[in-house]
Amino acid sequence: MNEKKELQQELELQEFQTPKNQQLEKLQEPNGEISSTGNETSESGISSPPISQNDNSNNENESLNITPNKPFVSMQEELQNLDIENIPIPPTIQTPKIYKNTNNLIHSKNNLSLPISLSQENIVKLDKVDIESNDQVNSNTDNNNNTNNNNNTNNNKNEKIGLRSKIFKSKIFIKIRGWWWHRGISTYIMLFYIALNIGVGVHMFYNMYHSDIFKFLGLSFCFSRTAARLINLNSAVILLPVLRNFLSWLRGTIVNNYIPIDKHLNFHKLCAFMLFCCTIIHCVGHYISFKKINDDVLKIDDGKSVAGDYLNININNFPDEKYLFFKSVPGITGHIMLLILILIVSSSMWRIRRPMFEIFWYVHHLFIPFYILLCFHGYSKILKKDPQSWMWIIAPFILYSIERLIRIARSKKRVILEKAIMHPSKVLELRMKRDNDNFNFKPGQYLYLNCPSIAYHEWHPFTITSAPDDPFISVHINIVGNWTRKLFKLLNPDNKLGLIQEDLKSTQNRGKRRILKIDGPFGAPAENFFKYRNLVLIGAGIGVTPFSSILRHLKNQNDKQTNADENHLKINKIYFIWISRQKNSFQWFTDILAELENDERIDSILEIHIFLTGALELDDYAKIKNAQKCHITNLHSKTLFGRPNFRSIFNQLTQLHQREKIGVFYCGNKALGKNIIKNCNKFNGKNNCHLIFHKENF
């Protein structure tokens, strides 16, 4: 009886500890007995069908030995039929917390913990074990404390890392980082350079202000000498941003992650602006000083000028008052250098450089005689000092000379022109045979093209539109300038559209196949596309050329994948946006776009958005309706009419790519570029999306 009472208590405890989803639903019978209705839950938690009172089948329950042809009985009656030795143990029952460290001592036949009560015998056994293993328990406690301390330390480190990660991925930090990369770092570099000029100028002005010559010539002398020192400084620095081979090498180093090399031309323009302004100040200061010297010399009758006490001049050297202005070494060299700078600055303006690049090219090379004249400008030693300009410019001029020697050596070999294609909208495509050993380039880079038949020393930059894996080198030339028109007439005198390589391969014109020379390749902003898993490529008109090379490269890399599980692209998504006024312009690259659309693996990551901003014809409206493909581009991607709404585009991008980095690449006119970078900066950081803008120097 005692065993039955203990067992009854244990069963009641089991029912109390069993979760609700594993307990049988209990109903109170009228006579006060408990019965089971509905589905019974087995040990495994799987409900079994309800047992009918008239069921004649032999159903065995692992918990209770229920007689088949007998209605449910009370628990007291069932206890009499129980096999105490074979009581099953529900898997959900857990050992009470008091047995946490002694589970190995309390177990049943099936090695599962039982919720047994603490009898006096069990307490004695537990105390004995605790006494015998007191040292071991203390040791385990110390180990646990050390483990907890280590865990706490790791948790603190993880919390710090998590906090740091949250800060770096926060909207404010992304905004600051985006501003720093787009404008901040270049702004600070330019401000630092301006501050350097101010510092050098203030130091020079202070020294001249306290010199003896100041007593005679006054402030005009201080300003002219200060400007002369700044001319030397800017003449030394202005050559560094135009070392194309050096900058191309620098793009492949870690420096490219911290310095905006893409904006090297902006720094070059800043140096040119400082150089031109300092030259004007230098000339005005000397005009005033020369006037003072002439007035002083004309007052002297004994042949000795008062200025001779301060300057290295004599009245015999002054046959007339215009001598210092136009007949002395400083006067002659100074005016020639001033004229050279005026020509260089004026030819660099967009309205002249864009349609007449050859003028810009030739005039810019006048910097060579400018440097030579600068070295001899102070040769007469009027200020009783040796000339110092050569010490400033010797090092950068040597670097530039090495740069030019590399270009000359690399551009001697002529390339074979295999194919020339005249596209609509006055675009000429040239395909040249590639020498894999001497010309290796990256997608997005550019080259310089020379045609000796037109001008032997004239080189023009063009973006490479072929992929590095292609067996040819291709460029697309927009016929807008004098040189490009001459090249077009040379290759296509009959002004035909389409393929014209048959004429090149003919016996009569076979010599034309070797009429071109190339120099390069050179680095460009578009080659940084591999740094991002999400890309936005925006091209306006002929500005699509850098992205043609990128898309062809992705196509070639995808073709190399023999296994569907391989991923040579390492790109998650590409948004290609092409904007043009003329519908015929889209025929330039529709072949590669169609191949990309037909490739399932690339089509899944590539979205093509084409915008036509020009007017449509009446036939276009009829063809647009119910068309399976766009009749303008012959692509599955529909052509959109009008200008793209970049505010909406970037807003959607930040929603689709939350907590991701997107590289935005643009090549086109400045007005559209300002709109893009404005919206790029506006939505940068929204949803923790980092938008990084790269602009091609177009």
UniProtKB/Swiss-Prot annotation:
Bias type Polar residues, positions: 16-25, 33-53
InterPro entries: FAD-bd_8, FAD-bd_FR_type, Fe3_Rdtase_TM_dom, Fe_red_NAD-bd_6, FNR_nucleotide-bd, RBOH/FRE, Riboflavin_synthase-like_b-brl
Names of required cofactors: FAD
UniProt keyword Hydrolase, yes or no: no
Subcellular location(s) of the protein: Membrane
Full protein name: Superoxide-generating NADPH oxidase heavy chain subunit B
This protein's UniProt keywords: Electron transport, FAD, Flavoprotein, Heme, Iron, Membrane, Metal-binding, NADP, Oxidoreductase, Transmembrane, Transmembrane helix, Transport
Domain FAD-binding FR-type per the UniProt entry, residue ranges: 404-528
Enzyme Commission code: 1.-.-.-
Record GO terms (molecular function): flavin adenine dinucleotide binding; heme binding; metal ion binding; superoxide-generating NAD(P)H oxidase activity
Region of interest: Disordered: 1-68, 134-158
Organism: Dictyostelium discoideum
Keyword Heme: yes
GO biological process, one term: defense response to bacterium
